Amino acid sequence: MDEAEGRPADLGNPPGSAAQPFLRPSPMLLQGQDYFFRSPATLLDFQERMFGADLVADEPGDPVPCVLVLARAADMEMNELSLALAEHDIRMVRIDADRCLDLALTIYTDTPLIEFQRWLLRPVLVWRRHFDITAIPVDPTTVHGAYVREQWSAVANWLACRGDWEQVNSVHSTEHLDRLTQLQGASAVGLRVPRTAVTTMPGRSRPGGGRCIVKTAGHHLLEPEPGALRGLFPRPLDIRLSGEAREPAPVLVQQYLDADHELRVFVIGDRAIGFRVQKLDPAQLWVDPDSVVVERVEVPEDLVQRLLALCRRWRLDVAGFDLLGVGDEWVFLEVNVNCDWRWFEHRADCADVSTAVHDWVRSRFAELSTAKTGWGSW
């Protein structure tokens, strides 16, 4: 011990030399990532605006069947769904993570009813999409913020798992559907997958023996503060720069494959709708979307059957699959259960996915709302 200071002597530096600070390099996936997006919390939902402005007459009587959506204000797919359902007199209500702090909400545990604002409703179909706890506008480093996040996390998970409500994309399955589990499942149904390593030392990993890319094991977007989203996009692995450096958290190192083209396939129920995507690098979809070429294409029947098998395996109703066409093979990359389709439709000048989703939700709602089920005591 250093008697003067009461601390261990610095054994790593010679006497009289200054201690050198340890500088940990920035994680590889945070280097050069310039994508930033501010997610607005502006209310755009058609039905919520109409009901909130008292432009729709209340109907006395039994609780109103509805579609319950857990999302965030910027979820334009759900804004569009709200309008489409209103055209068929189907009530949709939503709980947005970035607008939930002053919500008047009571959820009954012994009967499948909720009081939402001043309305008594009976959810028959629940869809949790972009209800991200990180979007709740509180400071999680404070006791108050941590408390609010914890309560909403518990209740949102329960809402999305209740057995007396039907779910879109069962959360019981999707909450554990990480990228590595996806690769195992895809391989099990006969799809080729890239060789992949999980490591904190990417410079020492070259699955496949050739060029590789580094990918996040988690989400492609970080939200370090509510509403502020930053991208984590795949990047080429340069072993000259990475060397023996250790990452502070595991990443995926994946075999690079020379693809003829990339395919995004949306599966809605038993339908598959495909788009061919042409881009120079993975991040281009976000950082330079106007330069990405998207065209509507038919999906080969053998691929459709494999994707439907995956949806049955993972209990998915609506999902977006990313694949590569390599020679005469399809290579599975990942599935996105919170898939956004309007951008692909806009680039390809079509509305096929929106139409299919709206039709599927209406059909499922009609089946469920007319089913004779017990509500418990009220």
Map each language-model feature to its residues.
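A short beta-strand motif that forms the metal-chelation/ATP-contact edge
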Residues: V67, C212-K215, V265-V267, E329-W343
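Loop-centered beta-sheet repeat module
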Residues: T181-E225
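Phosphate-binding site of ATP-dependent enzymes
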Residues: L85, G208-Q305, L310
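A short linear hydrophobic-aromatic micro-motif
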Residues: P194-R195, V251-L252, V318-F321
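Conserved N-proximal alpha/beta basic substrate-recognition cap immediately N-terminal to
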Residues: F22, L29-L30, Y35-P40, L44, ...
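Short hydrophobic beta-strand segments
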Residues: G61-A73
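C-terminal active-site "lid" helix and adjoining low-complexity regulatory extension at the edge
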Residues: A19-P27, G32-P40, E298, R312-L316, ...
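Short acidic-glycine loop/turn motifs at beta-strand connectors
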Residues: D89, T109-D110, V267-R271, V326-D328
